Amino acid sequence: MKRTYQPKKRKHAKTHGFRSRMATKNGRKVLKLRRLKGRYQLTVSDK
């Protein structure tokens, strides 16, 4: 049986990347909260 998680770097970045977070109001809220919390990595594209 094929496993359900087949990682793709491009899809990961397109869905959870910085630009996609900035594109929506809720995404910007996510970044704001992660900045407030002091996260070292805001999004997956900060690797």
UniProtKB/Swiss-Prot annotation:
Q: Which GO terms describe its biological process?
A: translation
Q: Looking at the record, which segments are called Disordered?
A: 1-26
Q: Carries keyword Nuclease?
A: no
- GO CC annotations? ribonucleoprotein complex; ribosome
User: Is the keyword Ribosomal protein in the record?
Assistant: yes
Q: Which Pfam families match?
A: Ribosomal_L34
Molecular function GO terms recorded: structural constituent of ribosome
The UniProt entry, under InterPro entries, shows: Ribosomal_bL34 (IPR000271), Ribosomal_bL34_CS (IPR020939)
Query: Which PROSITE patterns did the record assign?
Result: RIBOSOMAL_L34
Domain of life assignment: Bacteria
UniProt keywords (A-Z) are:
Ribonucleoprotein, Ribosomal protein
Q: Where is the composition biased (Basic residues)?
A: 1-19
Q: What does the similarity note say? A: Belongs to the bacterial ribosomal protein bL34 family.
What is this protein's record name?
Large ribosomal subunit protein bL34
Q: Which gene specifies this protein's sequence? A: rpmH
